[in-house]
């Protein structure tokens, strides 16, 4: 008996240090909240053993979610405006120009896998968040499911991270624990790899759209544009009247993406105590199927509004040149558009001081704004700027389908012109100058009025000069002049008979010569395009 007790005590003494050493290792493997593993994690967290009751709950959750009957193409849809009536064409006088405004019905259909993040909802956005795939997600107000969570694995795509350093296991996937895990991954890269990769270039995602309606821009950029436009303040009223042209640009500089390993079964994302009945009570059903944020892009998001009061058809080309930095020195019209345009920028991220910046300026300064934050480092921290969701049922990508109709407004300016008459011939001359002026009735139909110069068919002796001012809506200009020869058989001889001339800024009509040899010229200065 004593020998047995001695052996037993010896075994206890031998095993005690081993147990203490094991406890120390376990303690060092978790943070204070016992939520994040600091060791290199496996590709996906191992499923912890379940009791028979917990396994029953997990099986019921899997069966329920995988049995939800819905069409993934119809779950997330944004229907914008429907246009029934297109306003008619109209024209109006504006200073020394006549403006013609035309409207056409257009439509936009956009499939967005990436949902934009703005500051107001960044607190709801984190990798692995469980959300309902419904209209609130479409409206960029994700309805996060408040349930207990199991573990998940995050990975980051910063360069150089080896030996599983780019991954981390979150034992209890709450928002705070996940955000702490993301910070741990970023800090791990800063400490171990940043020196070897001092200039990590941001991945650029660029999209633009000429602005005509808010519904159109929401369909293009997602419902996050509603919040962005509170700062951009696109002037839809002036655009609709043809007095402004504006373009909106989304410019993303992505520093890194944090991705979530796909769950092998839906229940893997839930805590052991969660039941099917709890999910049903939270409104999870075929109309509100569960999804999860599978990837979050961190970086700098710039929204730009480019504005001009030019009526030129080259405005889009000028804006593109300003953004790309392309030289337009050889094109006077593009140069003038850029010179007389402005921009407003709303910037999220990329600054250690301010999370959101609003900047106004001239297009000449635009490139400086876009160049900032081009590389990732401690001084240019990234914020969540976009996220992707997947259906929990089958890990299929959850795509938001946006569509809207809108009225495209275009305007063209026709500058006033002038005809300068100079008669220095050795004869009596008579002129007949006429033109048409075009306006529009309330239905947009053309109203053409024929106009005549008040001095038509009146005899003029040399030296006679006059100027006829024509409005921008003048067209089909006819210039006729004849001279008196004094010959009985040909009392009047035609000097000039030019018809259907276009309106130009300065048209110089000169006649000279003798009764038998009259001459003329028709020269144009500063033609109007």
From Swiss-Prot:
Signal peptide (residue range): 1-24
Effect on the protein upon substituting residue 523 to S: In strain: F4233 / Serotype 1/2b, F5782 /Serotype 4b, F6789 / Serotype 1/2b and 12067
Alphabetical list of Gene3D superfamilies matching this protein: 3.30.1040.20, Perfringolysin (3.40.30.40), Perfringolysin, domain 4 (2.60.40.1430), Thiol-activated cytolysin superfamily/Thiol-activated cytolysin, alpha-beta domain (3.90.840.10)
Modification sites for Phosphoserine: 44
GO MF annotations in UniProt: cholesterol binding; identical protein binding; toxin activity
Entry's Gene Ontology BP terms: killing of cells of another organism; symbiont-mediated disruption of host phagosome; symbiont-mediated pore formation in host plasma membrane
Transmembrane segments: 214-227, 234-243, 312-321, 329-341
Domain of life: Bacteria
Mutagenesis or variant effect for residue 262 to W: No change in hemolytic activity
Impact noted for substituting residue 262 to K: Loss of hemolytic activity
Keywords associated with the record: Cytolysis, Hemolysis, Host cell membrane, Host membrane, Lipid-binding, Membrane, Phosphoprotein, Secreted, Signal, Toxin, Transmembrane, Transmembrane beta strand, Ubl conjugation, Virulence
pH dependence: Optimum pH is 5.5. Cytolytic activity is undetectable at pH 7.0.
Observed effect of gene inactivation: Cells lacking this gene have severely reduced cytokine production in the mouse Listeria-infected liver cells compared to wild-type.
Impact reported for residue 49 to A: Does not affect secretion and hemolytic activity. No defect in phagosomal escape. Shows a clear attenuation in virulence
Subcellular location: Secreted; Host membrane; Host cell membrane
Region (Disordered): 35-54
Complexes and interactors: Homooligomeric pore complex of 35-50 subunits; when inserted in the host membrane.
Protein name listed in UniProt: Listeriolysin O
């Amino acid at each position: 008996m004593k020998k047995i007790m001695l052996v037993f005590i010896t075994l206890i003494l031998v095993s005690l240090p081993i147990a203490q050493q094991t406890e120390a290792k376990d303690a060092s493997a978790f943070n204070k909240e016992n939520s994040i593993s600091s060791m290199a994690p496996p590709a996906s967290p191992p499923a912890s053993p379940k009791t028979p009751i917990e396994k029953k709950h997990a099986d019921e959750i899997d069966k329920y979610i995988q049995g939800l009957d819905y069409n993934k193409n119809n779950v997330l849809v944004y229907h914008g405006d429907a246009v029934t009536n297109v306003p008619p064409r109209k024209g109006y006088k504006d200073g020394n120009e006549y403006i013609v405004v035309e409207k056409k019905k257009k439509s936009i259909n956009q499939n967005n896998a990436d949902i934009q993040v703005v500051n107001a909802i960044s607190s709801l956005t984190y990798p692995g968040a469980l959300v309902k795939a419904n209209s609130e997600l479409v409206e960029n107000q994700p309805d996060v499911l408040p349930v207990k969570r199991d573990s998940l694995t995050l990975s980051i795509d910063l360069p150089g991270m080896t030996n599983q350093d780019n991954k981390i296991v979150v034992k209890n996937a709450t928002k705070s624990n996940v955000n702490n895990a993301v910070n741990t991954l970023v800090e791990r890269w800063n400490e171990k790899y940043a020196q070897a990769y001092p200039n990590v270039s941001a991945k650029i995602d660029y999209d633009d759209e000429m602005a005509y309606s808010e519904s159109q821009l929401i369909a293009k950029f997602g419902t996050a544009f509603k919040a962005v436009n509170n700062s951009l303040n696109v002037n839809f009223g002036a655009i609709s009247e043809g007095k402004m042209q504006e373009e909106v640009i989304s410019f993303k500089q992505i520093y890194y993406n944090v991705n979530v390993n796909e769950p092998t079964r839906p229940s893997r994302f839930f805590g052991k105590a969660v039941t099917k009945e709890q999910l049903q009570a939270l409104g999870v059903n075929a109309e509100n199927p569960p999804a999860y944020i599978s990837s979050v892009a961190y970086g700098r998001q710039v929204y730009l509004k480019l504005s001009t009061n030019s009526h030129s058809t080259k405005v889009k080309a000028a804006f593109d040149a300003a953004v790309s930095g392309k030289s337009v020195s050889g094109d006077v019209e593009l140069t003038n558009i850029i010179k007389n345009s402005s921009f407003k920028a709303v910037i999220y991220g990329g600054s250690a001081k301010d999370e959101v910046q609003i900047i106004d300026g001239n297009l000449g300064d635009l490139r400086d704004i876009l160049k900032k934050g081009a590389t990732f480092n401690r001084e240019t921290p990234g914020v969540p700027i976009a996220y992707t969701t997947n259906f929990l049922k089958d890990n299929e990508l959850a795509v938001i389908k946006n569509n809207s109709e809108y009225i495209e407004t275009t305007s063209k300016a026709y500058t006033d012109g002038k005809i300068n008459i100079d008669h220095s011939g050795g004869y009596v001359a008579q002129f007949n100058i006429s033109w048409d002026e075009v306006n529009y009735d309330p239905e947009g139909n053309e109203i053409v009025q024929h106009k005549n110069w008040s001095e038509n068919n009146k005899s003029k002796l040399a030296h006679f000069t006059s100027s006829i001012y024509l409005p921008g809506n003048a067209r089909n200009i006819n210039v006729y002049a004849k001279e008196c020869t004094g010959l009985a058989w040909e009392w009047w001889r035609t000097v000039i008979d030019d018809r259907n001339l276009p309106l130009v800024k300065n048209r110089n009509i000169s006649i000279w010569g003798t009764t038998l040899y009259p001459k003329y010229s028709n020269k144009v200065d500063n033609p109007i395009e």
